[in-house]
Amino acid sequence: MNKTVLKRLLSYLKPDRVIVTIVLVVSLISVILDVQLPKILGDATTLISERYIASNYTSVDLEGVFAIAKTLAILYILAAGLNFLGKYFMSRVASDIIYRLQKEIDEKFTRLPVRYFDEQSRGDLLSRATNDIQTIDDSFSQVSNQIFTTVLTFFGIIIMMFTVNIPLAIIGFLGIPLSLFIIGLIGKKSSTAFANRQETTGRLNGYIEEYYAGHEIVKAFNYEDRSQAEFQALNDELYEHAWKAQFFSGLMFPISRLINNIVYVFVAIVGGLFAASGMITIGGIQAILQYMRNISQPMGDAANMIGLTQSMLAAAERIFELLDAEEMEEEGDKEELPAIVGDVQFKHVSFGYTPEVTLMEDLNIDVKAGETVAIVGPTGAGKTTVINLLMRFYDITSGAIEIDGHNIQDYKVDSLRSKVGMVLQDTWLFKGTIRENIRYSRPDATDEEVVQAAKQAFADDFIRKLPDGYDTYITEETDNISGGQKQLLTIARAILASPSIFILDEATSNVDTRTEMQIQKAMDHIMEHKTSFVIAHRLSTIRNADKILVMQKGNVIEQGTHEELLAKQGFYAGLYRAQFE
Protein backbone atom coordinates (compact mmCIF):
# COMPACT_ATOMS: atom_id res chain seq x y z
CA MET A 1 0.00 0.00 0.00
CA ASN A 2 1.40 3.40 -1.02
CA LYS A 3 1.48 5.27 2.29
CA THR A 4 2.56 8.55 0.65
CA VAL A 5 -0.47 8.55 -1.67
CA LEU A 6 -2.77 7.56 1.21
CA LYS A 7 -1.43 10.35 3.41
CA ARG A 8 -1.90 12.88 0.63
CA LEU A 9 -5.43 11.69 -0.09
CA LEU A 10 -6.33 11.90 3.59
CA SER A 11 -5.06 15.50 3.65
CA TYR A 12 -8.20 16.38 1.66
CA LEU A 13 -10.15 15.69 4.86
CA LYS A 14 -8.70 18.76 6.57
CA PRO A 15 -11.40 21.25 5.45
CA ASP A 16 -14.02 18.84 6.87
CA ARG A 17 -12.17 17.93 10.07
CA VAL A 18 -15.03 19.24 12.25
CA ILE A 19 -17.53 16.98 10.48
CA VAL A 20 -15.06 14.08 10.62
CA THR A 21 -14.70 14.62 14.38
CA ILE A 22 -18.49 14.58 14.77
CA VAL A 23 -18.66 11.37 12.73
CA LEU A 24 -15.96 9.83 14.93
CA VAL A 25 -17.87 10.72 18.11
CA VAL A 26 -21.18 9.48 16.67
CA SER A 27 -19.53 6.26 15.50
CA LEU A 28 -17.93 5.76 18.91
CA ILE A 29 -21.27 6.10 20.72
CA SER A 30 -22.96 3.83 18.17
CA VAL A 31 -20.28 1.16 18.58
CA ILE A 32 -20.36 1.38 22.39
CA LEU A 33 -24.09 0.70 22.27
CA ASP A 34 -23.70 -1.99 19.65
CA VAL A 35 -20.99 -4.00 21.41
CA GLN A 36 -22.90 -3.93 24.68
CA LEU A 37 -25.86 -5.78 23.18
CA PRO A 38 -24.47 -9.36 23.11
CA LYS A 39 -23.33 -9.06 26.74
CA ILE A 40 -26.71 -7.65 27.82
CA LEU A 41 -28.44 -10.40 25.88
CA GLY A 42 -26.16 -13.00 27.47
CA ASP A 43 -26.80 -11.65 30.97
CA ALA A 44 -30.52 -11.69 30.22
CA THR A 45 -30.33 -15.31 29.09
CA THR A 46 -28.49 -16.24 32.28
CA LEU A 47 -31.03 -14.37 34.43
CA ILE A 48 -34.04 -15.94 32.72
CA SER A 49 -32.56 -19.44 32.84
CA GLU A 50 -31.59 -19.11 36.51
CA ARG A 51 -35.09 -17.90 37.46
CA TYR A 52 -36.62 -20.68 35.41
CA ILE A 53 -34.46 -23.24 37.20
CA ALA A 54 -35.20 -21.59 40.57
CA SER A 55 -38.95 -22.01 39.89
CA ASN A 56 -38.28 -25.72 39.45
CA TYR A 57 -38.93 -25.36 35.70
CA THR A 58 -42.54 -24.29 36.25
CA SER A 59 -42.66 -20.61 35.22
CA VAL A 60 -40.93 -18.07 33.01
CA ASP A 61 -40.42 -14.49 34.15
CA LEU A 62 -42.36 -12.90 31.25
CA GLU A 63 -42.24 -9.47 32.84
CA GLY A 64 -38.46 -9.67 32.99
CA VAL A 65 -38.31 -10.95 29.39
CA PHE A 66 -40.40 -8.02 28.11
CA ALA A 67 -38.30 -5.52 30.09
CA ILE A 68 -35.11 -6.94 28.59
CA ALA A 69 -36.63 -6.98 25.09
CA LYS A 70 -37.69 -3.35 25.47
CA THR A 71 -34.20 -2.31 26.59
CA LEU A 72 -32.57 -4.18 23.71
CA ALA A 73 -34.98 -2.65 21.18
CA ILE A 74 -34.18 0.88 22.39
CA LEU A 75 -30.44 0.21 22.22
CA TYR A 76 -30.70 -1.32 18.72
CA ILE A 77 -32.71 1.66 17.46
CA LEU A 78 -30.29 4.17 18.99
CA ALA A 79 -27.27 2.35 17.54
CA ALA A 80 -28.89 2.15 14.09
CA GLY A 81 -29.87 5.83 14.17
CA LEU A 82 -26.37 6.94 15.14
CA ASN A 83 -24.89 4.67 12.48
CA PHE A 84 -27.18 6.27 9.88
CA LEU A 85 -26.08 9.77 10.94
CA GLY A 86 -22.42 8.79 10.70
CA LYS A 87 -22.87 7.41 7.18
CA TYR A 88 -24.83 10.49 6.10
CA PHE A 89 -22.15 12.95 7.24
CA MET A 90 -19.30 10.82 5.88
CA SER A 91 -21.00 10.58 2.49
CA ARG A 92 -21.06 14.38 2.41
CA VAL A 93 -17.35 14.46 3.27
CA ALA A 94 -16.56 11.95 0.49
CA SER A 95 -18.48 14.09 -2.02
CA ASP A 96 -16.57 17.19 -0.88
CA ILE A 97 -13.25 15.43 -1.48
CA ILE A 98 -14.25 14.39 -5.01
CA TYR A 99 -15.46 17.93 -5.70
CA ARG A 100 -12.12 19.39 -4.59
CA LEU A 101 -10.16 16.86 -6.63
CA GLN A 102 -12.19 17.59 -9.77
CA LYS A 103 -11.75 21.32 -9.20
CA GLU A 104 -7.98 20.89 -8.82
CA ILE A 105 -7.79 18.85 -12.03
CA ASP A 106 -9.78 21.46 -13.95
CA GLU A 107 -7.57 24.27 -12.63
CA LYS A 108 -4.45 22.19 -13.32
CA PHE A 109 -5.38 21.83 -16.99
CA THR A 110 -5.34 25.62 -17.34
CA ARG A 111 -1.82 25.78 -15.88
CA LEU A 112 -0.28 22.97 -17.90
CA PRO A 113 1.92 23.92 -20.85
CA VAL A 114 1.02 22.88 -24.39
CA ARG A 115 4.03 20.57 -24.31
CA TYR A 116 2.29 18.37 -21.73
CA PHE A 117 -0.80 17.84 -23.90
CA ASP A 118 1.38 17.12 -26.94
CA GLU A 119 3.27 14.43 -25.04
CA GLN A 120 0.28 12.72 -23.39
CA SER A 121 -2.42 10.49 -24.82
CA ARG A 122 -5.72 12.34 -24.89
CA GLY A 123 -7.58 9.20 -23.90
CA ASP A 124 -5.28 8.63 -20.91
CA LEU A 125 -5.83 12.21 -19.74
CA LEU A 126 -9.59 11.75 -20.04
CA SER A 127 -9.29 8.48 -18.12
CA ARG A 128 -7.48 10.23 -15.27
CA ALA A 129 -10.04 13.03 -15.13
CA THR A 130 -13.09 10.74 -15.34
CA ASN A 131 -12.48 7.03 -14.74
CA ASP A 132 -9.89 7.48 -11.98
CA ILE A 133 -11.99 10.12 -10.25
CA GLN A 134 -15.01 7.82 -10.41
CA THR A 135 -12.94 4.98 -8.93
CA ILE A 136 -11.94 7.19 -6.00
CA ASP A 137 -15.54 8.35 -5.58
CA ASP A 138 -16.92 4.80 -5.47
CA SER A 139 -14.16 3.43 -3.23
CA PHE A 140 -13.86 6.36 -0.85
CA SER A 141 -17.61 6.54 -0.30
CA GLN A 142 -17.69 2.90 0.80
CA VAL A 143 -14.45 2.95 2.78
CA SER A 144 -15.21 6.20 4.60
CA ASN A 145 -18.64 4.89 5.63
CA GLN A 146 -17.09 1.75 7.14
CA ILE A 147 -13.67 2.76 8.40
CA PHE A 148 -14.61 4.26 11.77
CA THR A 149 -17.29 1.75 12.73
CA THR A 150 -15.14 -1.18 11.54
CA VAL A 151 -12.08 -0.21 13.58
CA LEU A 152 -14.06 0.78 16.67
CA THR A 153 -16.27 -2.32 16.48
CA PHE A 154 -13.23 -4.57 16.12
CA PHE A 155 -11.51 -3.25 19.25
CA GLY A 156 -14.81 -2.87 21.10
CA ILE A 157 -15.66 -6.55 20.60
CA ILE A 158 -12.21 -7.66 21.77
CA ILE A 159 -12.53 -5.56 24.94
CA MET A 160 -16.03 -6.90 25.63
CA MET A 161 -14.90 -10.49 25.12
CA PHE A 162 -12.24 -10.02 27.80
CA THR A 163 -14.86 -8.64 30.20
CA VAL A 164 -16.97 -11.78 29.72
CA ASN A 165 -14.28 -14.47 30.00
CA ILE A 166 -10.53 -13.94 29.64
CA PRO A 167 -9.48 -17.51 28.63
CA LEU A 168 -12.13 -17.76 25.89
CA ALA A 169 -11.30 -14.23 24.74
CA ILE A 170 -7.63 -15.20 24.36
CA ILE A 171 -8.58 -18.28 22.33
CA GLY A 172 -10.90 -16.18 20.13
CA PHE A 173 -8.18 -13.59 19.65
CA LEU A 174 -5.63 -16.13 18.34
CA GLY A 175 -7.14 -16.23 14.85
CA ILE A 176 -6.95 -12.46 14.32
CA PRO A 177 -3.15 -12.09 13.83
CA LEU A 178 -3.20 -15.04 11.42
CA SER A 179 -6.00 -13.43 9.40
CA LEU A 180 -4.20 -10.09 9.29
CA PHE A 181 -0.94 -11.76 8.21
CA ILE A 182 -2.57 -13.63 5.33
CA ILE A 183 -4.58 -10.56 4.28
CA GLY A 184 -1.35 -8.53 4.25
CA LEU A 185 0.35 -11.04 1.92
CA ILE A 186 -2.62 -11.13 -0.45
CA GLY A 187 -2.95 -7.34 -0.23
CA LYS A 188 0.49 -6.79 -1.78
CA LYS A 189 -0.44 -8.81 -4.86
CA SER A 190 -3.83 -7.12 -5.01
CA SER A 191 -2.24 -3.66 -4.82
CA THR A 192 0.03 -4.36 -7.80
CA ALA A 193 -2.87 -5.75 -9.81
CA PHE A 194 -5.06 -2.70 -9.12
CA ALA A 195 -2.25 -0.32 -10.15
CA ASN A 196 -1.74 -2.25 -13.41
CA ARG A 197 -5.49 -2.26 -14.02
CA GLN A 198 -5.77 1.54 -13.75
CA GLU A 199 -2.73 2.11 -15.98
CA THR A 200 -4.00 -0.31 -18.64
CA THR A 201 -7.48 1.25 -18.48
CA GLY A 202 -5.89 4.60 -19.31
CA ARG A 203 -4.07 3.14 -22.33
CA LEU A 204 -7.21 1.36 -23.51
CA ASN A 205 -9.24 4.58 -23.27
CA GLY A 206 -6.51 6.33 -25.23
CA TYR A 207 -6.72 3.71 -27.97
CA ILE A 208 -10.52 3.89 -28.12
CA GLU A 209 -10.41 7.70 -28.36
CA GLU A 210 -7.81 7.48 -31.13
CA TYR A 211 -9.84 4.86 -33.02
CA TYR A 212 -13.05 6.88 -32.74
CA ALA A 213 -11.36 10.10 -33.90
CA GLY A 214 -9.80 8.35 -36.89
CA HIS A 215 -12.46 5.78 -37.72
CA GLU A 216 -12.76 7.02 -41.32
CA ILE A 217 -9.03 6.50 -41.89
CA VAL A 218 -9.27 3.04 -40.32
CA LYS A 219 -12.03 2.09 -42.75
CA ALA A 220 -10.39 3.78 -45.73
CA PHE A 221 -7.22 1.70 -45.36
CA ASN A 222 -9.02 -1.54 -44.41
CA TYR A 223 -7.36 -1.48 -41.02
CA GLU A 224 -10.34 -2.91 -39.14
CA ASP A 225 -8.87 -6.38 -38.59
CA ARG A 226 -5.51 -5.08 -37.36
CA SER A 227 -7.26 -2.46 -35.25
CA GLN A 228 -9.41 -5.14 -33.66
CA ALA A 229 -6.29 -7.20 -32.97
CA GLU A 230 -4.59 -4.24 -31.27
CA PHE A 231 -7.71 -3.56 -29.24
CA GLN A 232 -7.99 -7.23 -28.31
CA ALA A 233 -4.38 -7.26 -27.11
CA LEU A 234 -5.02 -4.28 -24.84
CA ASN A 235 -8.34 -5.69 -23.71
CA ASP A 236 -6.70 -9.04 -22.89
CA GLU A 237 -4.05 -7.23 -20.87
CA LEU A 238 -6.74 -5.30 -18.98
CA TYR A 239 -8.67 -8.53 -18.41
CA GLU A 240 -5.56 -10.18 -16.96
CA HIS A 241 -4.93 -7.34 -14.51
CA ALA A 242 -8.62 -6.88 -13.68
CA TRP A 243 -9.35 -10.51 -12.78
CA LYS A 244 -6.20 -10.71 -10.68
CA ALA A 245 -7.17 -7.54 -8.82
CA GLN A 246 -10.68 -8.82 -8.17
CA PHE A 247 -9.50 -12.36 -7.38
CA PHE A 248 -6.88 -11.35 -4.82
CA SER A 249 -9.10 -8.75 -3.19
CA GLY A 250 -11.97 -11.26 -3.18
CA LEU A 251 -9.82 -13.88 -1.42
CA MET A 252 -9.45 -11.76 1.69
CA PHE A 253 -12.98 -12.09 3.04
CA PRO A 254 -13.46 -15.88 2.63
CA ILE A 255 -10.02 -16.62 4.11
CA SER A 256 -10.77 -14.33 7.04
CA ARG A 257 -14.18 -15.99 7.43
CA LEU A 258 -12.67 -19.49 7.29
CA ILE A 259 -10.16 -18.74 10.05
CA ASN A 260 -12.88 -17.11 12.13
CA ASN A 261 -15.19 -20.13 11.74
CA ILE A 262 -12.44 -22.55 12.80
CA VAL A 263 -11.73 -20.45 15.88
CA TYR A 264 -15.50 -20.17 16.49
CA VAL A 265 -15.89 -23.95 16.64
CA PHE A 266 -12.88 -24.24 18.95
CA VAL A 267 -14.28 -21.53 21.27
CA ALA A 268 -17.69 -23.28 21.32
CA ILE A 269 -16.11 -26.60 22.36
CA VAL A 270 -13.90 -25.04 25.04
CA GLY A 271 -16.82 -22.88 26.20
CA GLY A 272 -18.97 -25.98 26.64
CA LEU A 273 -16.27 -27.58 28.78
CA PHE A 274 -15.98 -24.38 30.84
CA ALA A 275 -19.77 -24.29 31.34
CA ALA A 276 -19.80 -27.92 32.44
CA SER A 277 -17.17 -27.14 35.06
CA GLY A 278 -18.95 -23.97 36.17
CA MET A 279 -16.25 -21.60 34.88
CA ILE A 280 -18.76 -19.64 32.76
CA THR A 281 -22.51 -19.16 32.60
CA ILE A 282 -24.72 -20.15 29.68
CA GLY A 283 -25.29 -16.47 28.95
CA GLY A 284 -21.52 -15.93 28.97
CA ILE A 285 -21.02 -18.62 26.33
CA GLN A 286 -23.82 -17.09 24.28
CA ALA A 287 -22.21 -13.64 24.52
CA ILE A 288 -18.74 -14.95 23.57
CA LEU A 289 -20.11 -16.88 20.59
CA GLN A 290 -22.14 -13.85 19.51
CA TYR A 291 -19.01 -11.70 19.71
CA MET A 292 -17.12 -14.29 17.66
CA ARG A 293 -19.82 -14.10 15.01
CA ASN A 294 -19.92 -10.33 15.18
CA ILE A 295 -16.14 -9.94 14.85
CA SER A 296 -16.29 -11.65 11.46
CA GLN A 297 -18.21 -8.62 10.19
CA PRO A 298 -15.47 -6.02 10.85
CA MET A 299 -12.85 -8.56 9.73
CA GLY A 300 -14.76 -9.06 6.48
CA ASP A 301 -15.30 -5.32 6.12
CA ALA A 302 -11.58 -4.77 6.70
CA ALA A 303 -10.73 -7.27 3.95
CA ASN A 304 -13.20 -5.57 1.61
CA MET A 305 -11.84 -2.14 2.51
CA ILE A 306 -8.28 -3.22 1.74
CA GLY A 307 -9.32 -4.14 -1.80
CA LEU A 308 -11.27 -0.91 -2.24
CA THR A 309 -8.43 1.13 -0.75
CA GLN A 310 -5.89 -0.39 -3.12
CA SER A 311 -8.12 0.37 -6.10
CA MET A 312 -8.62 3.91 -4.77
CA LEU A 313 -4.89 4.49 -4.18
CA ALA A 314 -4.00 3.20 -7.65
CA ALA A 315 -6.41 5.75 -9.14
CA ALA A 316 -5.26 8.50 -6.75
CA GLU A 317 -1.63 7.93 -7.70
CA ARG A 318 -2.45 8.56 -11.37
CA ILE A 319 -4.39 11.70 -10.47
CA PHE A 320 -1.56 13.01 -8.29
CA GLU A 321 0.87 12.38 -11.16
CA LEU A 322 -1.29 14.72 -13.22
CA LEU A 323 -1.55 17.30 -10.41
CA ASP A 324 2.23 17.18 -9.90
CA ALA A 325 3.06 17.64 -13.59
CA GLU A 326 5.31 20.59 -14.37
CA GLU A 327 3.30 23.75 -14.88
CA MET A 328 3.85 26.86 -16.92
CA GLU A 329 6.36 29.25 -15.42
CA GLU A 330 4.97 31.47 -12.66
CA GLU A 331 4.50 34.97 -14.05
CA GLY A 332 4.78 36.67 -10.67
CA ASP A 333 4.87 40.45 -11.04
CA LYS A 334 5.15 40.50 -14.82
CA GLU A 335 3.36 43.40 -16.46
CA GLU A 336 0.62 43.36 -19.06
CA LEU A 337 1.87 43.72 -22.61
CA PRO A 338 0.94 47.28 -23.63
CA ALA A 339 -1.00 48.16 -26.77
CA ILE A 340 1.05 47.13 -29.78
CA VAL A 341 1.55 48.31 -33.33
CA GLY A 342 2.79 45.00 -34.63
CA ASP A 343 6.57 45.02 -35.24
CA VAL A 344 7.78 41.44 -34.66
CA GLN A 345 11.40 40.33 -34.42
CA PHE A 346 13.01 36.95 -33.81
CA LYS A 347 16.58 37.66 -32.63
CA HIS A 348 19.07 34.79 -32.67
CA VAL A 349 16.39 32.34 -31.55
CA SER A 350 17.30 28.74 -30.78
CA PHE A 351 14.78 26.07 -29.87
CA GLY A 352 14.24 22.33 -29.63
CA TYR A 353 11.18 20.32 -28.58
CA THR A 354 13.56 18.13 -26.59
CA PRO A 355 16.88 19.11 -24.98
CA GLU A 356 18.69 16.51 -27.09
CA VAL A 357 17.56 17.79 -30.49
CA THR A 358 17.84 21.43 -31.62
CA LEU A 359 15.28 22.30 -34.30
CA MET A 360 16.12 25.99 -34.72
CA GLU A 361 19.45 27.68 -34.24
CA ASP A 362 20.15 31.41 -34.57
CA LEU A 363 16.82 32.14 -36.30
CA ASN A 364 16.33 35.79 -37.24
CA ILE A 365 13.06 37.23 -38.59
CA ASP A 366 12.13 40.91 -38.92
CA VAL A 367 8.49 41.79 -39.64
CA LYS A 368 7.28 45.37 -39.82
CA ALA A 369 3.91 46.45 -38.47
CA GLY A 370 1.10 45.91 -40.96
CA GLU A 371 3.04 43.45 -43.11
CA THR A 372 1.57 40.18 -44.27
CA VAL A 373 4.23 37.51 -43.95
CA ALA A 374 3.81 34.08 -45.47
CA ILE A 375 5.80 31.16 -44.13
CA VAL A 376 6.33 28.25 -46.51
CA GLY A 377 8.48 25.17 -46.67
CA PRO A 378 8.32 21.39 -46.68
CA THR A 379 6.76 19.37 -43.87
CA GLY A 380 8.88 19.56 -40.72
CA ALA A 381 10.64 22.74 -41.79
CA GLY A 382 9.53 24.59 -38.64
CA LYS A 383 6.65 26.71 -39.94
CA THR A 384 4.20 25.89 -37.15
CA THR A 385 7.02 26.02 -34.62
CA VAL A 386 7.53 29.72 -35.40
CA ILE A 387 3.88 30.32 -34.51
CA ASN A 388 4.12 28.18 -31.36
CA LEU A 389 7.07 30.28 -30.19
CA LEU A 390 5.36 33.58 -31.03
CA MET A 391 2.28 32.51 -29.05
CA ARG A 392 4.51 31.15 -26.27
CA PHE A 393 2.98 27.71 -26.46
CA TYR A 394 6.63 26.77 -26.14
CA ASP A 395 9.44 28.95 -24.78
CA ILE A 396 12.66 29.47 -26.69
CA THR A 397 15.97 28.01 -25.54
CA SER A 398 17.95 31.18 -26.22
CA GLY A 399 17.65 34.50 -28.02
CA ALA A 400 14.62 36.78 -27.88
CA ILE A 401 11.26 37.36 -29.56
CA GLU A 402 10.15 40.98 -29.45
CA ILE A 403 6.94 42.79 -30.34
CA ASP A 404 7.40 46.55 -30.73
CA GLY A 405 10.72 46.15 -28.94
CA HIS A 406 9.14 44.35 -25.95
CA ASN A 407 10.59 40.93 -25.12
CA ILE A 408 7.50 38.72 -24.89
CA GLN A 409 9.14 36.66 -22.11
CA ASP A 410 8.93 39.70 -19.83
CA TYR A 411 5.14 40.05 -20.02
CA LYS A 412 2.13 38.03 -18.96
CA VAL A 413 1.33 35.38 -21.54
CA ASP A 414 -2.43 36.09 -21.37
CA SER A 415 -1.86 39.70 -22.37
CA LEU A 416 0.22 38.52 -25.34
CA ARG A 417 -2.37 36.03 -26.58
CA SER A 418 -5.20 38.53 -26.19
CA LYS A 419 -3.55 40.62 -28.91
CA VAL A 420 -3.18 37.75 -31.37
CA GLY A 421 -5.97 36.10 -33.35
CA MET A 422 -5.43 32.52 -34.53
CA VAL A 423 -7.18 30.43 -37.14
CA LEU A 424 -5.82 26.90 -37.26
CA GLN A 425 -5.96 24.20 -39.88
CA ASP A 426 -7.86 21.95 -37.47
CA THR A 427 -11.17 23.60 -36.72
CA TRP A 428 -12.47 23.26 -33.20
CA LEU A 429 -15.99 24.15 -32.19
CA PHE A 430 -17.36 23.85 -28.69
CA LYS A 431 -20.70 22.44 -27.65
CA GLY A 432 -23.13 25.33 -27.82
CA THR A 433 -24.82 27.67 -30.28
CA ILE A 434 -23.12 29.25 -33.27
CA ARG A 435 -23.45 32.62 -31.54
CA GLU A 436 -21.65 31.27 -28.45
CA ASN A 437 -18.88 29.74 -30.56
CA ILE A 438 -18.15 33.00 -32.37
CA ARG A 439 -18.35 34.94 -29.09
CA TYR A 440 -15.82 32.58 -27.49
CA SER A 441 -12.97 34.95 -28.39
CA ARG A 442 -14.72 37.93 -26.76
CA PRO A 443 -17.45 37.00 -24.27
CA ASP A 444 -18.60 40.61 -23.82
CA ALA A 445 -19.30 41.13 -27.53
CA THR A 446 -22.81 42.23 -28.49
CA ASP A 447 -25.05 40.27 -30.86
CA GLU A 448 -24.50 42.95 -33.49
CA GLU A 449 -20.72 42.55 -33.23
CA VAL A 450 -21.08 38.78 -33.57
CA VAL A 451 -23.15 39.18 -36.74
CA GLN A 452 -20.68 41.72 -38.15
CA ALA A 453 -17.77 39.33 -37.58
CA ALA A 454 -19.72 36.54 -39.31
CA LYS A 455 -20.41 38.83 -42.29
CA GLN A 456 -16.73 39.71 -42.61
CA ALA A 457 -15.92 35.99 -42.61
CA PHE A 458 -18.63 35.33 -45.25
CA ALA A 459 -20.42 33.07 -42.75
CA ASP A 460 -23.59 35.13 -42.24
CA ASP A 461 -25.40 33.81 -45.32
CA PHE A 462 -25.14 30.11 -44.49
CA ILE A 463 -25.83 30.75 -40.78
CA ARG A 464 -29.14 32.49 -41.57
CA LYS A 465 -30.18 29.56 -43.77
CA LEU A 466 -29.92 27.16 -40.82
CA PRO A 467 -33.24 26.37 -39.04
CA ASP A 468 -32.27 28.27 -35.88
CA GLY A 469 -29.81 30.71 -37.41
CA TYR A 470 -27.25 31.96 -34.91
CA ASP A 471 -28.95 29.90 -32.19
CA THR A 472 -28.28 26.62 -34.01
CA TYR A 473 -26.78 24.17 -31.52
CA ILE A 474 -23.59 22.48 -32.67
CA THR A 475 -20.78 20.30 -31.37
CA GLU A 476 -17.37 19.38 -32.73
CA GLU A 477 -18.93 16.23 -34.21
CA THR A 478 -21.99 18.02 -35.62
CA ASP A 479 -22.97 17.03 -39.14
CA ASN A 480 -25.40 19.83 -39.97
CA ILE A 481 -22.60 22.11 -41.21
CA SER A 482 -19.70 21.28 -43.52
CA GLY A 483 -15.98 21.36 -42.78
CA GLY A 484 -15.62 24.57 -44.77
CA GLN A 485 -18.45 26.22 -42.84
CA LYS A 486 -16.79 25.22 -39.57
CA GLN A 487 -13.64 26.95 -40.77
CA LEU A 488 -15.62 30.08 -41.57
CA LEU A 489 -16.93 30.11 -37.99
CA THR A 490 -13.41 29.87 -36.57
CA ILE A 491 -12.37 32.76 -38.79
CA ALA A 492 -15.34 34.81 -37.57
CA ARG A 493 -14.28 33.98 -34.02
CA ALA A 494 -10.78 35.34 -34.69
CA ILE A 495 -12.17 38.46 -36.39
CA LEU A 496 -14.39 39.24 -33.39
CA ALA A 497 -11.32 39.34 -31.13
CA SER A 498 -10.05 42.30 -33.19
CA PRO A 499 -6.40 41.36 -32.64
CA SER A 500 -3.35 43.42 -33.54
CA ILE A 501 -1.65 40.37 -35.04
CA PHE A 502 -3.28 37.64 -37.13
CA ILE A 503 -2.02 34.08 -37.47
CA LEU A 504 -3.54 31.90 -40.16
CA ASP A 505 -2.24 28.33 -40.06
CA GLU A 506 -3.51 26.66 -43.23
CA ALA A 507 -6.76 28.54 -42.63
CA THR A 508 -8.17 27.82 -46.10
CA SER A 509 -7.02 24.22 -46.41
CA ASN A 510 -10.43 22.73 -45.53
CA VAL A 511 -12.62 24.77 -47.87
CA ASP A 512 -13.49 24.54 -51.53
CA THR A 513 -12.08 26.89 -54.14
CA ARG A 514 -15.10 29.21 -54.16
CA THR A 515 -15.14 29.48 -50.37
CA GLU A 516 -11.37 29.91 -50.38
CA MET A 517 -11.73 32.91 -52.68
CA GLN A 518 -14.33 34.43 -50.35
CA ILE A 519 -12.13 33.89 -47.32
CA GLN A 520 -9.08 35.25 -49.11
CA LYS A 521 -10.98 38.39 -50.04
CA ALA A 522 -12.14 38.81 -46.45
CA MET A 523 -8.65 38.15 -45.13
CA ASP A 524 -7.12 40.71 -47.47
CA HIS A 525 -9.53 43.30 -46.07
CA ILE A 526 -9.16 42.26 -42.42
CA MET A 527 -5.36 41.97 -42.50
CA GLU A 528 -4.96 45.38 -44.05
CA HIS A 529 -2.73 47.48 -41.77
CA LYS A 530 -2.34 44.54 -39.36
CA THR A 531 0.67 42.29 -38.95
CA SER A 532 -0.26 38.86 -40.25
CA PHE A 533 1.48 35.51 -40.40
CA VAL A 534 0.16 33.05 -42.96
CA ILE A 535 1.25 29.42 -43.13
CA ALA A 536 0.23 27.87 -46.41
CA HIS A 537 1.02 24.88 -48.58
CA ARG A 538 -1.03 26.22 -51.50
CA LEU A 539 1.40 28.86 -52.69
CA SER A 540 -1.23 30.44 -54.93
CA THR A 541 -2.90 31.89 -51.81
CA ILE A 542 0.13 33.95 -50.73
CA ARG A 543 1.11 35.79 -53.91
CA ASN A 544 0.12 39.13 -52.42
CA ALA A 545 2.11 38.69 -49.20
CA ASP A 546 4.48 41.56 -48.41
CA LYS A 547 7.16 39.06 -47.51
CA ILE A 548 7.54 35.31 -47.92
CA LEU A 549 9.82 33.38 -45.59
CA VAL A 550 11.04 30.07 -47.00
CA MET A 551 12.01 27.66 -44.23
CA GLN A 552 13.95 24.43 -44.23
CA LYS A 553 15.23 22.48 -41.22
CA GLY A 554 14.27 25.27 -38.82
CA ASN A 555 15.99 28.11 -40.64
CA VAL A 556 14.95 30.80 -43.12
CA ILE A 557 16.81 30.02 -46.32
CA GLU A 558 15.07 32.55 -48.59
CA GLN A 559 12.90 35.61 -48.17
CA GLY A 560 11.29 38.20 -50.40
CA THR A 561 8.12 38.85 -52.35
CA HIS A 562 6.54 36.24 -54.60
CA GLU A 563 8.05 37.82 -57.74
CA GLU A 564 11.49 38.27 -56.16
CA LEU A 565 11.68 34.65 -55.07
CA LEU A 566 10.55 33.36 -58.46
CA ALA A 567 13.21 35.50 -60.09
CA LYS A 568 15.89 33.94 -57.87
CA GLN A 569 15.05 30.50 -59.25
CA GLY A 570 15.81 29.02 -55.85
CA PHE A 571 14.04 26.68 -53.44
CA TYR A 572 10.76 28.64 -53.46
CA ALA A 573 10.63 28.70 -57.23
CA GLY A 574 11.05 24.93 -57.22
CA LEU A 575 8.19 24.51 -54.74
CA TYR A 576 5.97 26.81 -56.78
CA ARG A 577 6.62 25.01 -60.06
CA ALA A 578 6.09 21.63 -58.40
CA GLN A 579 2.54 22.60 -57.44
CA PHE A 580 1.55 23.33 -61.01
CA GLU A 581 3.36 20.57 -62.84
Which residue ranges define each predicted feature?
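Transmembrane helices of ABC transporter permease
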Residues: 15, 19-32, 75, 142-196, ...
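Transmembrane helix-loop-helix hairpins at lipid-water interfaces of multipass membrane proteins
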Residues: 2, 20-82, 162-167, 278-282
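A short amphipathic helical element positioned immediately N-terminal to and/or at the very start
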Residues: 2-15, 125
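Short intracellular "coupling" helices and adjacent cytoplasmic loop segments at the cytosolic face
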Residues: 95, 103-127, 131-133, 206-230, ...
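Alpha-helical segments in transporter systems
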Residues: 10, 18-43, 72, 87-91, ...
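ABC-type nucleotide-binding domain
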Residues: 331-332, 337-581
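An intracellular "coupling" helix at the cytosolic face of ABC transporter transmembrane type-1 domains
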Residues: 114-115, 131-140, 144, 148, ...
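Helix-loop-helix
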Residues: 51, 160-174, 244, 248-317, ...
